[in-house]
């Protein structure tokens, strides 16, 4: 099985390391960044290799996680997106991209793995339906 690359954007270093470890233990390759700006740089530079995004909502500087996901969907309309946030969940319906998942902090790592795996599997099922 080929390795799937997830772009992980979280500005709290300890959380970033925890999320990165959990994703790697689940078999994913991880591009970990600490800002929305760095996330966009990776998306634009390596758009074909990123299979999904896990992003915090609020960063110290623009762009926000909402913006990262919207731009990712401009590049790839089916890009799986998991939002992670401590206080932005109420805005998900109005700010989030369609067919995304919101996980509220704090959460157990298995929730993160299940969420991104579900979206990746849904995407693969959609591709298989088209073939």
Short names for language-model regions:
Residues 82-84:
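Hydrophobic/aromatic residues positioned on beta-strands within the core alpha/beta folds
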Residues 50, 54-70:
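Conserved phosphotransfer microenvironments
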Residues 44-48, 71-78, 95:
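Conserved phosphotransfer cores of two-component systems
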Residues 103-104:
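Residues at the ends of beta-strands that form strand-to-helix hinge/output surfaces
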Residues 13-32:
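Two-component/phosphorelay signaling modules centered on CheY-like receiver
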Residues 107-119, 124-129:
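C-terminal output helix
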């Amino acid at each position: 099985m080929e390795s799937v690359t997830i772009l992980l954007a979280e500005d709290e270093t300890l959380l970033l390391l925890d999320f990165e470890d959990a994703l790697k233990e689940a078999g994913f390759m991880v591009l970990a960044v600490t800002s929305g700006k760095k996330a966009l740089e990776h998306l634009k530079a390596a758009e074909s290799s990123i299979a999904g995004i896990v992003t915090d909502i609020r960063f110290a500087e623009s762009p926000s996680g909402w913006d990262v996901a919207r731009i990712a969907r401009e590049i790839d309309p089916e890009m799986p997106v998991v939002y992670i946030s401590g206080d932005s969940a109420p805005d998900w319906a109005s700010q989030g991209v369609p067919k995304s998942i919101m996980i509220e902090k704090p959460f157990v790592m298995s929730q993160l793995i299940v969420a991104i795996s579900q979206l990746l599997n849904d995407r693969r099922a959609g591709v298989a339906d088209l073939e």
